[in-house]
C-alpha cells in the first residue's frame, strides 16, 4: 500500500512538473519595471495592445511591450510581462524567472559579464534636465554646471557619468522620482 501511495504521489509530481514545463513553453516571460513611460507602464485593461502582467489583474503597455509582442510572435509564443524592480531584472534573468529583459538597459561592461545583449532597438544620448528658471537654464557646457547638485536614477550607468562634470555635487541616486 505504501508503495502504491508513493507511486501515485510520484506520478502526480511528474505530471505537475510536466504541466509547468508545457505552460512555461507557451509564454515568453519578459522582465520590465512597467513603470517607465513611454517605454513601459502599468494599466488596468488590455486596451491598445497591452499585455497581461503575471500574477496580477493589470496589464503593461508601451514601446518595450510592443517590441516584446513582436519578438514573442516571431517565436510562436504568448508574451507575459513579469513586473520586476530595476535592480531585480538581471537576477531574474540569470535565475530563469524571466526569459528576457526589455527595459532600455544599457550594455555596460559589468552587465555583459553576466548577461548577453541583442542589437539595440533604441538609442539615446545622456542629457541634463534643469528647471526653466534655474541658474543652469542657459548652460552650454559641462563646466557651466559647477556647484550644481546632480543625480540620476539608481542602478543606471548615467549615475557614474556625473563624476565627469567638473565641480558638480553628486547627490545620492534616486530610487524613483
Language-model segments: what does each one mean?
Residues 25-104:
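Extracytoplasmic small-molecule ligand-binding "clamshell" domains
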Residues 78-144, 155:
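Acidic, polar ligand-binding/catalytic clefts
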Residues 7-17:
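Bacterial N-terminal signal peptides
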Residues 1-5:
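Positively charged n-region of N-terminal signal peptides that target proteins for export
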Residues 34-37, 57-73, 127-177:
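Bilobed "Venus flytrap"/periplasmic-binding protein-like clamshell domains
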Residues 18-24:
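Sec/Tat signal peptide C-region and signal peptidase I cleavage site
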Residues 41-44, 120-122, 126, 150:
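Short capping/connector residues at structural and topological boundaries
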Residues 40-42, 112-113, 161-162:
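Short glycine-/acidic-enriched loop or helix-start segments at secondary-structure transitions
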Amino acid at each position: 500500500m505504501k508503495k502504491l501511495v508513493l507511486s501515485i504521489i510520484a506520478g502526480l509530481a511528474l505530471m505537475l512538473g510536466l504541466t509547468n514545463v508545457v505552460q512555461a513553453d507557451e509564454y515568453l516571460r519578459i522582465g520590465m519595471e512597467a513603470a517607465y513611460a513611454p517605454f513601459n507602464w502599468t494599466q488596468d485593461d488590455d486596451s491598445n495592445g497591452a499585455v497581461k502582467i503575471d500574477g496580477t489583474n493589470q496589464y503593461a503597455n508601451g514601446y518595450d511591450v510592443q517590441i516584446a509582442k513582436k519578438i514573442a510572435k516571431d517565436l510562436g509564443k504568448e508574451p507575459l510581462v513579469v513586473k520586476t524592480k530595476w535592480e531585480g531584472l538581471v537576477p531574474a534573468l540569470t535565475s530563469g524567472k524571466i526569459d528576457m529583459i526589455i527595459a532600455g538597459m544599457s550594455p555596460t561592461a559589468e552587465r555583459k559579464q553576466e548577461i548577453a545583449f541583442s542589437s539595440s532597438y533604441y538609442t539615446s544620448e545622456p542629457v541634463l534636465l534643469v528647471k526653466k528658471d534655474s541658474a543652469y537654464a542657459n548652460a552650454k557646457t559641462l563646466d557651466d554646471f559647477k556647484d550644481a547638485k546632480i543625480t540620476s536614477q539608481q542602478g543606471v550607468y548615467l549615475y557614474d557619468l556625473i563624476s565627469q562634470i567638473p565641480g558638480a555635487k553628486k547627490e545620492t541616486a534616486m530610487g524613483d522620482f
